[in-house]
């Protein structure tokens, strides 16, 4: 690494052959004389057999791993993990954990593993849980967290800390952090919550407080960029199979039966796409990224008619954000409303399209349509085995980063390696399905559905290029 280049508060390090490190802030940036201490892990018997357990300071992870011989080395992120020196003495730490936004499988596992990581690995004894999301900071609601408190919470869905949307008041939150003497803040939440975490970090930095802020990204839709996937996603795809299986049973039990399942996916159709591929029983998958139309040649109604004549039944999976442009003008008026987190309130596309299908085929054939919306069932369940491992590693990586003095970062899996990512990279855009990518082609091949694209849409889609860092298989 050769030089550090200021870029509107971004910490950019450049090196030979086009190497770029998008680094995260560190305590040494603001407090160059801050003392450091030997990492307690070096005396931990559990890690005594691990060779090279501590991460080298120069270890980085590339954002893009598929390259050509003459490609520049490209963007990298700092590799997560424990360092040989830490910036906090265990007895001086007062940590807090907060969960924000909607529910997601794995929240309790992340809480548990932050507590266990701080306690077992670093000997931290004072850990607070902020009750009820961001507003819990200035409502003075806290829960004392220790190993006994969190022992079996991973077996339950939801979050023992409670959550809420909105309620972010940066000044009041940082006042509370300062008044309580908190010096480590762990924020578990989606893109909106990570923006809030970034604002908290900037205010803390402005006040020159020796407080570390780390984010653990939470989004069941998997719409956070850069990272391979977010925790809870695998569980959501697995749980969605129950609804799809039920829809398939209903559809095959009636003449011209249609099972319609609405899954989560406000702007990104990853759950719908992966649940469809996992099921193999779905005939049509509709997502926000791929426009469709109902009537005319190549439209949805024509495909439904064709499939019912061929098979006598059909299963459709639709993401909640798909087809919003097709809703009637009277329904569109209310879509300008937003929830407390600033998300646009969507109309129920599942109910609307169910009625449109029934109306269209009413005079053509006897048709039975069953509509299933498992949204809250899916997000309220405990995380599965895969997500439990994911949550554990994310939580431990966040703890290692904070103890090592890193600050103002989100932890995430990039190309199979855990990394520390600047807040701005996580919040600048959303991760979406690239419909010109091979994964969407695999889905179309699996369902044998048409693309539902009109000629103008096809021309536009051919101009799209997938972002490096989106989900790759």
Curated annotation (Swiss-Prot):
Keyword entries, A-Z: Allosteric enzyme, ATP-binding, Cytoplasm, Glycolysis, Kinase, Magnesium, Metal-binding, Nucleotide-binding, Phosphoprotein, Transferase
Binding-site residues for substrate, renumbered to this chain: 219-221, 264-266, 320, 376-379
Ligand binding (Mg(2+)): 191
Binding site for ATP: 102, 165-166, 190-193
Record GO terms (molecular function): 6-phosphofructokinase activity; ATP binding; metal ion binding
A Pfam family that the UniProt record links to this protein: PFK
Protein name in UniProt: ATP-dependent 6-phosphofructokinase 1
The organism of origin for this protein: Arabidopsis thaliana
């Amino acid at each position: 690494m050769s030089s550090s280049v200021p870029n509107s508060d971004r910490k950019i390090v450049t090196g030979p052959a086009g190497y770029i490190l998008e680094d995260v802030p560190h305590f040494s940036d603001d407090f160059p004389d801050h003392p450091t201490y030997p990492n307690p892990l070096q005396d931990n018997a559990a890690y005594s057999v691990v060779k090279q357990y501590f991460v080298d300071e120069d270890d980085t992870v590339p954002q893009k791993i598929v390259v050509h011989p003459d490609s520049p080395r490209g963007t990298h992120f700092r590799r997560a993990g424990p360092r040989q020196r830490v910036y906090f003495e265990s007895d001086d730490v007062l940590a807090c954990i907060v969960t924000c936004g909607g529910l997601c499988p794995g929240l309790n596992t992340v809480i548990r593993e932050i507590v266990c990581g701080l306690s077992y690995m670093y000997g931290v004894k004072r850990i607070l849980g902020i009750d009820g999301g961001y507003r819990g900071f200035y409502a003075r609601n806290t829960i004392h967290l220790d190993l006994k408190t969190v022992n079996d919470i991973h077996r339950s869905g939801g979050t023992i800390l409670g959550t809420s949307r909105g309620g972010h008041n940066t000044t009041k939150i940082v006042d509370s952090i300062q008044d309580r003497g908190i010096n480590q803040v762990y924020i578990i939440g989606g893109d909106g919550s990570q923006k809030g975490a970034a604002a908290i970090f900037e205010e803390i930095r402005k006040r020159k407080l020796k407080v570390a802020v780390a984010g653990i990204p939470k989004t069941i839709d998997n719409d956070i960029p850069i990272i391979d996937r977010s925790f809870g996603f695998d569980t959501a795809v697995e749980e969605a199979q129950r609804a799809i299986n039920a829809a398939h049973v209903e559809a095959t039990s009636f003449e011209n039966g249609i099972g319609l399942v609405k899954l989560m996916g406000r702007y990104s159709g990853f759950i719908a796409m992966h649940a469809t591929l996992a099921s193999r029983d779905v005939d049509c998958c509709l997502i926000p990224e791929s426009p469709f139309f109902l009537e005319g040649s190549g439209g949805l109604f024509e495909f439904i008619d064709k499939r019912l004549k061929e098979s006598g039944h059909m299963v459709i999976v639709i993401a909640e954000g798909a087809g919003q442009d097709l809703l009637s003008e009277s329904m569109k008026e209310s879509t300008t409303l937003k929830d407390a987190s600033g998300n646009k309130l969507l109309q129920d596309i599942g109910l609307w399209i169910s009625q449109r299908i029934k109306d269209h085929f009413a005079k053509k054939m006897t048709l039975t349509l069953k509509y299933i919306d498992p949204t809250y069932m899916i997000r309220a369940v405990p995380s599965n085995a895969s997500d439990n491992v994911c949550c554990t590693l994310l939580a431990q990586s966040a703890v290692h980063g904070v103890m090592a003095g890193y600050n103002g970062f989100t932890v995430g899996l990039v190309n199979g390696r855990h990394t520390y990512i600047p807040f701005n990279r996580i919040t600048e855009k959303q991760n979406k399905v690239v419909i010109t990518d091979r994964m969407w082609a695999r889905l179309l091949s699996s369902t044998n559905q048409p693309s539902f694209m009109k000629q103008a849409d096809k021309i536009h889609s051919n101009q799209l290029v997938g972002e490096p860092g989106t989900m790759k298989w």
